[in-house]
Every structure is written in structure tokens, then in C-alpha cells.
Amino acid sequence: MACSSLTQRPADAVVGASDPRVQDVGVGIFEKGGNAADAMVAMMMTSGVVTPSRSGLGGGGICQILDPNEGRVKTLNFLYRRNNGMGMPALAKGAFSLQKYGKLRWQDTLDDSIRLARQDVVVSEQLAKDILNAKGLPLEWKKLKKGDKVSRKDLAATLLKISEKGSGVFYNGEVSEGLSKQGFSAEDLKSYRATFMDSMDVSTAAGRAYFPNPSAISTLGYNLWNALENPEKEQEALQTVLSLREKNIAMEEASYGESFFAADKDGLIVVCSVSNGGLFGNKKLMKEGFFAANPFSREKSETFFFNILQTNPDVTDAMAVVAGVGSHAWPDALSLMRDDEEALEISDQRKEELDNFISLKCAKGYPNQSMSCRENQNIVFVYTGK
């Protein structure tokens, strides 16, 4: 299990991501006066610049949003679906939809991703490993090693268009015209929508636990949580995990992805998981600078994503958050969330090399208006990856 730092500044603002460059972008958004939604948009778009193996404009994902003013948790579903042998690019639509919760101008949330894409991006250790493990990459990518630099200027041009004209240019404008010439259905691009809905929830000793809706992998977690609440169903829960692992053995590559977390001083909390459906998606680099996603069906793509958001009874404060990509991370996730023997026994069945998630725990809730979770020393942040 590899650990990553959690960045907390300014006061009562927290961001989490596996790449320090992505974390820095999230922090920068808070320093500009943005909130958790603004930071999340910026981090998701930046991740596609620096870690295109696991995220990007070609992919999609799931978010959960806790707005204390509403007293409920919403799911933002922007999963990609099959489209002419490629996955429908969904990230831009998801990020633009999330901006409804933001405070900054849309352009301000994309400035850093554009700036980084205009530069030659340094290949991180994680990206170098992904390049080594990926088969069928374009030669100019396959030869890259840690510390090398790669041009993302084509992506920068695409991001600039999205920044200036909104996500509409990507799905029904200049960018979509180019995508339709490379195999995407112009009609499907035009009709694609990200959707908001109420998250699934279950009662807990501390309050409630929320799961994205409708995600197949989250339905599994929902059922596992319920089973673990009943000691008589402990073995049933364990067998469920083992059965899922056996069933998904051929889909392990699709477990690669990224997760992000952001919380602000006003109590808005956003947690997201994204993926290309495999390392570098289907390995096709579009002229617009991003890799197309793997062409999994919507039903299969739903099994790649999960996150849990545990709240107080009034649904105004988060006690714990965990997010990740891939069914193999569920055992560790449940173990971190619950800290009990049943969850730990399930955790013993994990495959560590496939786990990939982030976690935040605040025993007294986060954020407390007068004191942050970190100041209370009730925080656990974990990133596990390949």
C-alpha cells in the first residue's frame, strides 16, 4: 500500500489526489476563492494532462456531492458508453455539470490544466509504470520513461476551446466535428448527457452511508455494508467479495483509474472517481490530444467505479469518505470505513496490487467550522495504487 500526502491549505480546505501536481492545482483554486466543486473540476481536468493513462477527456466517471444546505447527497453520473468501438468521451460533460455547485467562472477552473498542457509534461513514476504495462501504445508514447517530457499541446488547444465556449463545443461544435471524422457518432455526441440523482443510502451507527446511484459496484458495496451490519451474514459478505473477484478476473485492466476528494470551509464535499476503462483506454490517441476510452458497455463500466460518503444523521457533515476504481479495492475500503473485525476479514482477501483508492476519516466530522479535521488529528488519508 503506497501512501500519498493530503494537502490542506488554506484553513479548512482539503484536496486529495495521487499526483502532487493535481493536488497543487486544487489548492490553487481555493486560493483563488473557489470552493470544493471548482477544485474538483480543476483536478479532474488536470489529471488527464499529467496522467492520461488513467483519466482524461476520453473517459468518464462518478461523483458524490454533499451540500450541507440541501441536507442530502447527490450522485453525478457521467459514465462513458459504447460508441462505434470506442467509449463515449464523458469527462467534459461531467466536469461542466459539476460546475453548477462552483463559485468561480468556468474558464478559471481550466486555466491550470491548459497551462500545464502547453508545457512539456514530465513523465511521473506512475505514468512510466503504466506505459510499461500498456500494450499497443503509439510508438512516441511507448518509448517514454520516467523523467522524460511529452508534448500535450494538442490537448491544450482542445482544453482552451472548452474553456472559452463550454462543454457544448466538445459535443456539438468545433471539437465534435473533428471527433466525428475519427469514428464517433455525431448524433450520439450531441445527445450525451450527464445526470444528477439522489445517492443510495443506508443507516449506520454514526448516521448514514451514501453510495452512487446507479452504479453496479456501489450496489455491491451497499449490500456488503448491510450484510456486515448483521454478524450472521459475515460469511455471506465474504463469499460475495470472492465471487465478484472471480467473475471480474478478465476485467482487471479496467480497474485502472483515479480518484479525487475536495472539501471546503462551507461544508461542500465532493468525491469523484474517473477512468478510461483501462490503461490509456483503447490506446487510440485522438487528434484532439486525448486517448479514447475502452468500448465497454454502460453496464460493465458501472462496475469500475465506487465511492462511499458517510455522514452524520442530519446529512450536514461528513465523517468518512472513500473513493476508488475497481472492485478489488472494495475490501480495503470497507475495512477503513468500518474498523471492525468483519471488514478486516474481508480486507484480508484483497489483491493489493490492484487496489486504487483514497480515504478520509474524521471522527468528529469535517469540516467543523471552528476547527479542521487535521487539527483534531482524526484524519486518515490513503492512496493505494499499482
For each predicted feature, which ranges?
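Acidic/polar residues at beta-strand termini and the immediately following turn/coil
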Residues: 67, 77, 152, 312, ...
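Ordered hydrophobic segments in well-structured contexts
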Residues: 210, 320, 380-381
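Cofactor-centric catalytic regions
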Residues: 194, 200, 353-386
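Accessory "access/gating" subregions that flank catalytic or transport cores
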Residues: 14, 30-32, 51, 133-214
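Proteins synthesized as precursors that undergo proteolytic processing into mature forms
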Residues: 3-141, 156-157, 163, 172, ...
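Polar low-complexity intrinsically disordered regions
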Residues: 1-4, 386
